[in-house]
Amino acid sequence: MLLGSLWGRCHPGRCALFLILALLLDAVGLVLLLLGILAPLSSWDFFIYTGALILALSLLLWIIWYSLNIEVSPEKLDL
């Protein structure tokens, strides 16, 4: 089974802290964004803008996590 072997070897990489923070901020930002859109609140704009800003910060953490997990062999670096 190809999927079974892939899921069995799944690991977060070298920077698990950035991964956990990015996932946490994704969840919080999405909840705030949906709360601002769907709930009948008088301060809906605060929730929408805050959720969008948190999702943007989460995107930065995803980029940092991905960049720190890139592996380049020493031969390609010409060291």
From Swiss-Prot:
Residues passing through the membrane, by range: 17-37, 46-66
Pfam families in alphabetical order: TMEM238
Entry keywords, A to Z: Endoplasmic reticulum, Membrane, Transmembrane, Transmembrane helix
Domain of life: Eukaryota
Induction field: Induced by FOXA1 in well-differentiated colorectal cancer (CRC) cells.
Membrane protein topology class: Multi-pass membrane protein
Classification via InterPro entries: TMEM238
Main location: endoplasmic reticulum
Record-level GO BP terms: intrinsic apoptotic signaling pathway in response to endoplasmic reticulum stress
A cellular component annotation (GO) from this entry: endoplasmic reticulum membrane
Subcellular location: Endoplasmic reticulum membrane
Quaternary structure and interacting proteins, as annotated: Interacts with BRI3BP.
Additional remarks: The TMEM238L transcript is unstable, and this instability is partly mediated through a conserved region containing AU-rich sequences in the TMEM238L 3'UTR. Cancer cells lacking this conserved region display decreased proliferation and clonogenicity.
Protein role: May play a role in inducing apoptosis during endoplasmic reticulum (ER) stress and in the inhibition of proliferation and tumorigenicity.
Name of the protein in question: Transmembrane protein 238-like
UniProt organism field: Homo sapiens (Human)
Origin organism lineage: Eukaryota, Metazoa, Chordata, Craniata, Vertebrata
